[in-house]
């Protein structure tokens, strides 16, 4: 009879747990069902690693699953990413700790079957694609938002100027010029309605600016970042050229929508008209759209009406640009820039500066306190919402004035009991809805209480 070595045995011995355990039968069922039994060891392979049987005292068996009562998780369920046990050549199960893993990596270079054994099941486990990390980062990046805003501004500005240019072409079909009141009203209504509709559509995407002067004003107010402002200005100029090309190619009449000075209008007069009308338009945008209030969602109506009124005044004298992009497109596609073209750039930019300056002035003077409650919006009313910055500033000023009038310095140590009591009283007061005229009485009473407390402390010390 020929003796066979354990290394050349076609049928390896079944997996056996350690005889030291009291649960050999329960664990043996799981070991016999393990998928690693489907990978028999190769023949005539020299065993380089010393096999180590399972020692249950070094292995903490996991708890039962909550989904299936009485179910013990398999080896793959315990360690889904790392195979903790390998079937050695002689039928034992070896523990794959850090040293054995390093040995297996070295051994896999000379034994390809071992590398396949380590990766075959792992490939099946990773059939489901991992999340696209780069795509997720891109979706959360600022540049993605800039691109969305640029696309919205491109389409919105193109539509706004397309309808405006087309309205001018329709108004001039009978050969009459803007001094005609009907033509003047038609052009003004077309531009005003076009801005109202397109701004209402795109203000949630890009802000619905459609005007480099408006973009500059919002950048000064830090309502738009400098990078986005630059991208939007370039987009608005390109959209004006696109709108002019569409009107020129679609309508049979020759394109005649360029802005020029009216007869008898000097450059200085045209410059002032453009600056004033643009300032009125931008200030309307700031107060209705930038300054949030109860009626912000209907701001496009007021903005469109402001443009309509400005066109009614400025069209006979300057053509009513109020927008550098509106004058740039028709002149750029035919490459014909008149001598007074600078007016339609410098005038609106100056108007934007005037609007921002006036807004900063009234904001510094806290215009909210001049006539509060006009919107019927308690959240933006400083007399009803003490959480507003304006209301808190008023509290601090009044408290400081009352403290100085009583001969006490407001700039005291915060660790003093009087200062802490004052802060607690102010916090309790700001949580209520009391009227503004009662603040003086409240703080005056607090000062009296603090004075009495200090006198009592002095008497105790003496």
Swiss-Prot record:
SUPFAM superfamilies: Aquaporin-like (SSF81338). A motif (NPA 2) lies at residues 323-325. Induction: Expression is higher in conidia than in vegetative hyphae. Residues 410-425 have a biased composition (Basic and acidic residues). The chain crosses the membrane at residues 147-167, 183-203, 230-250, 270-290, 297-317, 342-362. Residues 168-182, 251-269, 318-341 are extracellular. A motif (NPA 1) lies at residues 211-213. It is found in: Membrane. It holds the Pfam family MIP. Belongs to the MIP/aquaporin (TC 1.A.8) family. This is Aquaporin-1. It comes from Botryotinia fuckeliana (strain B05.10) (Noble rot fungus).
